[in-house]
């Protein structure tokens, strides 16, 4: 399938101005000045799209999404629905990192990894963190490093809550251990080993992060 987007305003991410974009299958093969590209009439499977008054950008990366739904802090009826590929891509998100929030009980790591795999199968790039607000971290295997090392979709730990009334109020030693275990998992797997932190409005502020 060949697609030609004509006369579209491109940010790549730098501003390129009005251009034509030629796409073959799922790859951009050429970007040229507006009006300079065309598809020969003898190509049976082709589509031309008028990009006038439209903007084309790379897909956005959203590194904190409750793909299983959020909420629940006001009771069971307060839970929000799962994210969908259509809902994400509608707003230009093509890479997503899923996480659990306050509720690591009604939603768990098995469900989060399964949801992440499903989004990947649908065509979006999807990853996730191991854990939720709580410390000790509830992992899928028996450890943070093992989760990150052995499960393709898991790239770090989170969302760990600090300085928040919904947090487990981790000590400095506990928070340091989470950081060290996440770092180890990243080193062993060749991943970044990210820690995603939820920071509330408590008086401790960023104290734990600064000390670590």
Regions found by a protein language model. Give the residues of each.
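Metal-associated gating/positioning segment near the N- to mid-region
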Residues: 51-114
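Hydrophobic/aromatic beta-strand patches that form the interior of the parallel beta-sheet core
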Residues: 5, 47-49, 61, 97, ...
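Divalent metal-coordination and catalytic microenvironments
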Residues: 8, 26, 53, 64, ...
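Histidine-rich, glycine-flanked metal-binding segment
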Residues: 2-3, 10-57
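Metal-coordinating catalytic core of metallo-dependent amide/deamination hydrolases
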Residues: 118-212
């Amino acid at each position: 399938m060949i697609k030609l987007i004509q006369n579209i305003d491109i940010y790549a991410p730098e501003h390129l101005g009005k251009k034509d974009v030629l796409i073959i299958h799922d790859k951009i093969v050429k970007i040229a000045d507006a009006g300079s590209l065309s598809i020969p009439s003898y190509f049976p499977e082709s589509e031309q799209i008028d990009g006038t008054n439209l903007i084309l950008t790379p897909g956005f990366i959203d590194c904190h999404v409750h793909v299983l739904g959020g909420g629940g802090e006001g009771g069971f009826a307060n839970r929000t629905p799962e994210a969908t590929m259509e809902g994400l891509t509608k707003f230009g998100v093509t890479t997503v990192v899923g996480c659990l929030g306050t509720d690591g009980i009604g939603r768990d790591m098995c469900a989060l990894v399964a949801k992440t795999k499903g989004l990947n199968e649908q065509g979006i790039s999807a990853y996730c963190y191991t854990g939720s607000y709580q410390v000790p971290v509830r992992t899928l295997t028996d450890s943070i490093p093992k989760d990150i090392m052995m499960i393709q979709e898991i790239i770090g730990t989170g969302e760990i809550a600090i300085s928040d009334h919904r947090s487990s109020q981790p000590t400095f030693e506990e928070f340091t251990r989470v950081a060290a275990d996440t770092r180890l998992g990243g080193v062993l797997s060749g991943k970044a080993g990210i820690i995603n932190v939820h920071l509330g409005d408590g008086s401790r502020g960023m104290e734990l992060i600064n000390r670590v």
